[in-house]
């Protein structure tokens, strides 16, 4: 077992009951283009066109052969684009249940599957895009091979679902997915999990279980990769979530695209925080209708630390998200708030009474309590960074755009979510995720 000592479990109210319920009927789903780093779409459908579930919507120009498929059957009602015609979302109104069929196999055939067969089925179905590389967090190029594959079978983000509850409902599909993934690498398939039992994978020596414990970010792929098989400019691994492993298992045994998602609907503004079974790309306005407390709320696809804010074209469940968080919009200003005792405020430093109330859960809002200011190194970053990285020096170099120094300090091991806690505890109110992405893009372009 690998025990993480540094980090932070945010004491936020509204944790979900770990019981799965069926969610409301969803009428619209969407595929969000901005979730895929560096992707440039070549559209294969138009607004008003009817599509089947699993039908190709577009192909990535920068990664030829990688296609993106429809998560539901219905009509394409909107293709939203932003600045420089960046694809924001493709919205589908669900009608009917037609779907594309893919290759299916008996479990007894899994050991005879070739890498080419597995890759073809994943690409054709669109499940290839569930895989992400580290470094750079891109969809892998067809024909490439990683040193290892990491399956994130735990989640330590604030308000997250217990992954073992969800895996227990589809044990066979999870094991099938793991066995299929072994065909994509000559290395190990590392299943990273928290305390508790997971399904037995039999005698497949390629699959290894790695137990992690401790505060967030103990459940992030970046943490697992750092402690088991660190990456570099010349070493690449892939990672994916446990629900995508289940979808891969069902694809190969049924020949159909499985797009169900079990998510946690949680947060201080949710009336009944719980686990909900819904679908990939679900409309968050439909999903949360009648579920929230009165007032102005912010709906977030993903964690409160690094999720995507719901807005006019982004109010859909993200491809890599298993959590919908809801916070109150904090628009009020507090006079001399810095001098108050702060019994209802949490701080990682000893500046509020809330810091000492270890069992209290706080109704966080979106209030930032101040604006952007100088970066002050007072040890906060080191408290929440469990990786063997000099956090303050790295963050300083990221802000300065020093790619050489940032690379030497380990930025290639990181993704935006790995710096989310640094953003939260930063007294200067800097957003380190977007800055990291700019530096990674520059490093990749420079070769």
Swiss-Prot record:
Composed of six subunits; NqrA, NqrB, NqrC, NqrD, NqrE and NqrF. InterPro entries: NqrA (IPR008703), NQRA_2nd (IPR056148), NqrA_C_domain (IPR022615), NQRA_N (IPR056147). PANTHER family: NA(+)-TRANSLOCATING NADH-QUINONE REDUCTASE SUBUNIT A (PTHR37839:SF1). This is Na(+)-translocating NADH-quinone reductase subunit A. Coiled coil: none annotated. It catalyses: a ubiquinone + n Na(+)(in) + NADH + H(+) = a ubiquinol + n Na(+)(out) + NAD(+). Keywords: Ion transport, NAD, Sodium, Sodium transport, Translocase, Transport, Ubiquinone. NQR complex catalyzes the reduction of ubiquinone-1 to ubiquinol by two successive reactions, coupled with the transport of Na(+) ions from the cytoplasm to the periplasm. NqrA to NqrE are probably involved in the second step, the conversion of ubisemiquinone to ubiquinol. Its EC number is 7.2.1.1. It holds the Pfam family NQRA_N. It comes from the Bacteria. It is an enzyme of class 7 (translocase). Belongs to the NqrA family. One of its GO terms (molecular function) is oxidoreductase activity, acting on NAD(P)H, quinone or similar compound as acceptor. GO terms for biological process: sodium ion transport. The gene is nqrA. NCBIfam families: nqrA, PRK05352.1-2.
């Amino acid at each position: 077992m690998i025990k993480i000592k540094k980090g932070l479990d945010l004491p936020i109210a509204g944790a979900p009951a770990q019981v799965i319920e069926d969610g409301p009927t969803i009428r619209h789903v969407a595929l969000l283009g901005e979730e895929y780093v560096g992707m440039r779409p070549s559209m294969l459908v138009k607004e008003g066109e009817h599509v089947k579930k699993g039908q190709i919507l577009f192909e990535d120009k920068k990664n030829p052969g990688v296609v993106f498929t429809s998560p539901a059957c219905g009509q394409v009602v909107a293709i939203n684009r932003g600045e420089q015609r960046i694809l924001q979302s493709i919205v589908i109104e669900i009608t009917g249940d037609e779907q594309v069929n893919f290759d299916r196999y008996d479990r007894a055939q899994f050991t005879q599957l070739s890498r080419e067969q597995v890759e073809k089925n994943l690409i054709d179905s669109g499940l290839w895009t569930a895989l992400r590389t580290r470094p750079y967090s891109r969809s892998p190029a067809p024909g490439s091979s990683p040193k290892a594959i990491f399956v994130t079978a735990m989640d330590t983000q604030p308000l997250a679902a217990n992954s073992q509850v969800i895996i227990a409902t589809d044990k066979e599909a999870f094991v099938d997915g793991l066995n299929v993934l072994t065909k994509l690498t000559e290395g190990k398939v590392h299943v990273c999990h928290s305390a508790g039992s997971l399904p037995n994978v039999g005698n497949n020596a390629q699959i290894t279980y790695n137990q992690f414990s401790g505060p967030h970010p103990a459940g992030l792929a970046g943490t697992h990769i750092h402690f088991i098989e660190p990456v570099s400019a010349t070493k690449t691994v892939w990672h994916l979530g446990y629900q995508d492993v289940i979808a891969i298992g069902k694809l190969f045994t049924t020949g159909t695209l499985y797009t169900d998602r079990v998510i946690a609907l949680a947060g201080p503004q949710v009336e009944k925080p719980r686990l909900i079974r819904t679908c990939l790309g679900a409309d968050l306005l439909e999903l949360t209708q009648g579920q929230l407390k009165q007032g102005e709320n912010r709906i977030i696809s993903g964690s409160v630390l690094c999720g995507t804010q719901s807005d006019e074209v982004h109010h859909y469940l993200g491809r890599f998200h298993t959590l919908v968080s809801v916070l109150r919009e904090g628009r009020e200003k507090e006079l001399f708030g810095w001098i108050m005792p702060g019994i209802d405020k949490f701080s990682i430093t000893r500046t509020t009474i809330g810091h000492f109330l270890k069992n209290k859960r706080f109704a966080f809002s979106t209030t930032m309590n101040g604006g952007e200011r100088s970066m002050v190194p007072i040890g906060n970053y080191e408290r929440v960074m469990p990786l063997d990285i000099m956090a303050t020096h790295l963050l300083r170099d990221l802000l300065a755009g020093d790619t050489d120094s940032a690379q030497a300090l380990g930025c290639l091991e990181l993704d935006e979510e790995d710096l989310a806690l640094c953003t939260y505890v930063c007294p200067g109110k800097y957003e380190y995720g977007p800055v990291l992405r700019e530096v990674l893009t520059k490093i990749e372009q420079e070769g």
